[in-house]
Amino acid sequence: MKYHILIVPTALRVLAEIPDRRVQKILQERIDALSHDPEKQGKALTGELAGCRSVRAAGQRYRIIFRIDRGRVMVLVLALGMRKEGDRKDVYVLAKKLLRLRLI
């Protein structure tokens, strides 16, 4: 079954602001690949991001955080960005902040 992909505006903005067009293309291709068997891709997240999944992209540096809505056969891309463990600009830190503020 093929899933429809929906990218939230904040994730679209982050994608558009990546200066390297090759990285943008790789991320877009990885997002498109989520339309086929998204449950088998990436890993399930815990804690504040429970119910979401994360996949690596662009040479393991970037993460794409998404949620699967089986009822509407849709993958909702909530956030994407660089993995910078311990940094306040880390993609997981930003995704948690957006969820707390109910912006995604």
Language model: regions and residue ranges:
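Amphipathic alpha-helical interface surfaces
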Residues: V23, L27-R30, Q41, L45, ...
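Enriched for short, Lys/Arg-rich terminal
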Residues: H4, R13, R67-I104
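Short proline/glycine- and basic residue-enriched helix-capping loop/turn segments at helix->loop/beta transitions
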Residues: L34-S35, E39
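Arg/Lys-rich, positively charged N-terminal/basic patches that mediate binding to nucleic acids
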Residues: M1-R30, I104
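Basic/aromatic recognition patch in beta-strand/loop cores that engages polyanionic ligands
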Residues: K40-E85
